[in-house]
Amino acid sequence: MDRRTFLGISGSTLASLASGASLAAKEQKIESLPDYKPTGVKLLTETTPAADGFHFPAEWAAHEFTVMVLPPPQNWIGYGIPLDDVRGQWADVANKLSEYEAVLMVVRPEDKAIAKRIFSKDIQLVEFPVNDGWSRDSGPMILVNGKGERRAAGFTFNGWGGKFPPYQDDALLKARLCKHLDIPMYPINWVLEGGAVAVDGEGTLLTTEQCLLNKNRNSATDRSKIEKVLNNSLGTKKVIWLGNGLEPDPITDGHIDGLAAFASPGMVLLHTTKDRNDPNFAICQDAKRRLKESTDAQGRKLDVIELPLDADLSHINFYIANDCVLVPISARRRDNDRALGILREVFPKRKTIGLDATVLGEGGGGIHCITQQVPKV
């Protein structure tokens, strides 16, 4: 298969991104823990989420609402896509999602007027400064315990390895949101984006070596240390390591949410291709082998459901919401139909809805990348 793009990023765009990212990484220092105190968020610094009995629930657990962020122009200028088209696709996702659960949309003060015009009146707006619109990565990862309480894992955000400065407002977004929502936050001096991990809610976490072992995130690449940070912060018990994410991906460095996702405890959806000439063939086969050889935190062998690769975007980058699954689709009807058919079988109790995500793909993401759930307690 001739894969001109991954998630819809053209070859020329990739080249410019790669050179720009390299320059940005040299010019912008990779920062550590931000100063959260001016946000007024309640910080929990004396213990860890796991020690306090908190964990990050699976995406299919009931949501109170979903956090999204209306993208500003900053990182879209070089894509040659009208900003109205970009925001229009965000609005398509948000408006459809709002039919199934509440949506909290973060907007810059100067964008409030356009937000009121393009979003459903059911969507709540909150004003904060932001640098980009990928709430999966910059938003808070909300944890729960058995007492009906919520706290947040405040991982550090550094603009995907310093590639897209400035990112200081995005680095503070989780703290500002937690203050707004009155949710205490554990400040974690470790860089992690939400799209880099997937959990099953029963102690198992999926990730990729390509992202988490990348020194543009954290200097330490010792697996045991990384696993300890993840388990202590997200309440997981076992980390399953896949190798690389799909290629090419100069932005996220192989986020798991473009390659694989838990569908339920013990079941993993995995993108695969039968085209041996596809550079992703070996990546997908390696991921499949690792999953088949693994057991989860409960000792179960994993059931791996293969989802055929689309030439233009990642169908795996779906979002499991209350009573529905929102799936990125492209202009390739045959690829869409195959993916949607498989997902309808996997999620029989939810309505599977395909939404055009080609513009999201041009920016290197999908529906999962622009959504972050707040679990119901």
Where are the language model's segments positioned?
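N-terminal export signals
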Residues: T5-K26
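The feature marks the mature, well-folded catalytic cores of soluble enzymes
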Residues: K26-V377
